[in-house]
């Protein structure tokens, strides 16, 4: 996510989403009554079109709408913002209905009464865009190429050689192999990422993973191992074409949310540090007991929920918006769509 411009005196922020996660942020922060300004397409009839019963030609124009509804389509990578026109060219009637579609790299201006948690979601999206999406290690017994993959760029970090050889003694080769693995692991340890893909032909990738498991346990849970047919840049291209990176990244986000819901259910089962449902969450807030508030994305536009989110953040609690598209999100929805992990037990 990028902030293009801010006009604080008018409560306007101009944004450019860069990926699917940014669109999901927009979907969650745009609400009924907000004003959206963007370049969009609309059919416009001239007098001749009316006489011929022609629907008119589509034309690009800059429009402003007052939001009535927002939809998120993950498959087409679009946020659809439905509303009534409040600003536009003279030949476009004010008050008529229009839908603005936003996809990655489209710019839009949002005018609204901004809530603290909405600003925080934007800041988190901006920080996320600065971090690598995933590190990719394409390797075999002889060489490892390490890449930093972002949503819109790929950077080669380094290439590391093993210096092993069939001409060398077995023990020497084993020592060289350990040094090779250590060197790769040290590079990976320098990066703040949640996902590391280790890919390659043969058994080197599995041997490296076993080495990581024993020598660098802090990296173990970040690593996913995949088989590919070749190494170097061609191997990276194979990884991208097969959609492996996108799958890992999507699974990672779902996994984080699933872990939180599992922890919630465990605490509920033992009547421990958890509450669920609006009434119980409100009660916990009265004691400043909520450490992490879990909210279904289906409820973020509910005014009562918004107040709970605001209060939680004012008290130093963390707020996690959980997607209702996966099983754990559906479990949260079944619990009333809102729950809290507590700092301490309450009566």
From Swiss-Prot:
Q: What is its EC number?
A: 3.1.-.-
Q: Does the keyword Nuclease apply?
A: yes
Instruction: Give the record's keywords alphabetically.
Output: Cytoplasm, Endonuclease, Hydrolase, Metal-binding, Nuclease
Cited PANTHER family = PELOTA (PTHR10853), PROTEIN PELOTA HOMOLOG (PTHR10853:SF0)
Query: Into which family does the record put it?
Result: Belongs to the eukaryotic release factor 1 family. Pelota subfamily.
**Role:** May function in recognizing stalled ribosomes, interact with stem-loop structures in stalled mRNA molecules, and effect endonucleolytic cleavage of the mRNA. May play a role in the release non-functional ribosomes and degradation of damaged mRNAs. Has endoribonuclease activity.
The domain-related comment in the record is:
The N-terminal domain has the RNA-binding Sm fold. It harbors the endoribonuclease activity.
Q: Which HAMAP family match?
A: PelO
Protein known as: Protein pelota homolog
Which species is this record about? Methanocaldococcus jannaschii (strain ATCC 43067 / DSM 2661 / JAL-1 / JCM 10045 / NBRC 100440) (Methanococcus jannaschii)
Chain's gene name: pelA
